[in-house]
Swiss-Prot record:
Membrane-topology descriptor: Multi-pass membrane protein
Keywords: Electron transport, Membrane, Mitochondrion, Mitochondrion inner membrane, NAD, Respiratory chain, Translocase, Transmembrane, Transmembrane helix, Transport, Ubiquinone
EC number(s) given by UniProt: 7.1.1.2
Record protein name field: NADH-ubiquinone oxidoreductase chain 2
Subcellular location field: Mitochondrion inner membrane
Organism: Myosorex kihaulei
Length: 347
């Protein structure tokens, strides 16, 4: 793909998300989603292969279906309210359809089936955009209309997403699929707290993007896509292998790393609102996620698979990826738990 065309597509994706973030008119929000989808499809197929074409087709069909449901909901809402403003949600059927459309775009269970398949079929760069930037727009719309969403429906989807995100990642050997199931579980945590404290959802989203970006950048640096190739990284970059281990544990939510902060704050907020069964269930299901992160950590850092070459790579095979952003990203992904009291006061 021509680099200029690729830059134009990325700018279109950013523009589509920006339109959604700044609009209070439903038609402009729908238009932003369409711009985002149409620009994302060529990005998914940047490195053309039959698998990438299949992934792009699955992405298009899912997103187009969600957009169709969203437009149907907007027309129903217009019939009953006579307005296009985002704050004026008066019809329960329209609210239900909008929730279904947004959760499809977000990849929440039970509409999660496209996320692992699409992520596995594309490059690491496209997978990073899909699992981070593309989550911002649906969550931003849900943030604005959370008062109109059925809380029982959203909490059921959230709990189901945490459960499926944990179970789905247990038997995976492909790193992109593992990160996709991790994304489903994290989206479940975010939507669970949205009804009680939407600002906490934004903090959770920020930390999730930081940790996921750190992991994908380390995967790209080492050109690893499977657990087997990940287990051989100690031979090339021993320091980065240790950093990868801590970032993985942070994604799993193990204290005293950054990833423990959002889980701690969400459980604290839920118990403060007299909810006991929900945070207990979420904490138990989070252990499944932590288990497959621990398994990845074990195969990455605590085992040394037999290899013929125990020396560093030859100069002509040295990796040329830039690592300027990795240091601050890894630091933020692992070491900002002490700032938790400040964030609790802010939210």
């Amino acid at each position: 793909m021509n680099p200029l065309i690729f830059i134009m597509l990325i700018l279109t994706i950013i523009l589509g998300t920006s339109i959604i973030l700044t609009s209070t008119h439903w038609f402009m929000i729908w238009l932003g989603f369409e711009m985002n989808m149409m620009a994302m499809i060529p990005v998914l197929m940047k490195k053309y292969s039959p698998r990438a074409a299949e992934a792009a087709t699955k992405y298009f069909l899912t997103q187009a279906t969600a957009s169709m449901i969203l437009m149907l909901a907007l027309i129903i809402n217009l019939m009953y309210s006579g307005q296009w403003t985002i704050m004026n949600m008066t019809n329960n059927m329209a609210s239900l359809l909008i929730t279904i459309a947004l959760t499809m775009k977000l990849g929440l269970a039970p509409f999660h089936f496209w996320v692992p398949e699409v992520t596995q079929g594309v490059s690491l760069q496209a997978g990073l955009i899909l699992l981070t930037w593309q989550k911002i727009a649906p969550l931003a719309v849900m943030y604005q209309i959370f008062a109109s969403i059925n809380p029982n429906l959203l909490l059921t989807m959230a709990l189901l997403s945490i459960m499926i995100g944990g179970w789905g990642g247990l038997n995976q050997t492909q790193l992109r699929k593992i990160m996709a199931y991790s994304s489903i579980a994290h989206m479940g945590w975010m939507t669970a707290i949205m009804i009680y404290n939407p600002n906490l959802m934004l903090l959770n989203l920020l930390l999730y993007i930081l940790m996921t970006t750190s992991m994908f950048m380390m995967f790209m640096y080492n050109s690893t896509t499977t657990t087997l190739s990940l287990s051989l990284t100690w031979n090339k970059t021993p320091l980065m292998t240790v950093l990868m281990m801590t970032t993985l544990l942070s994604l799993g939510g193990l204290p005293p790393l950054t990833g423990f902060m959002p889980k701690w704050m969400i459980i604290h907020e839920l118990t403060k609102n007299n909810s006991v069964i929900l945070p207990t269930s979420m904490a138990i299901l989070a252990l499944i996620n932590l288990f497959f992160y621990m398994r990845l950590t074990y195969s990455t850092s605590l085992t040394m698979f037999p290899t013929i070459n125990n020396m560093k790579m030859k100069w002509q095979f040295q990796n040329t990826h830039h690592t300027t952003l990795l240091a601050p990203l890894i630091t933020l992904s692992t070491l900002i738990l002490p700032l938790t009291p400040m964030f609790i006061l802010m939210t």
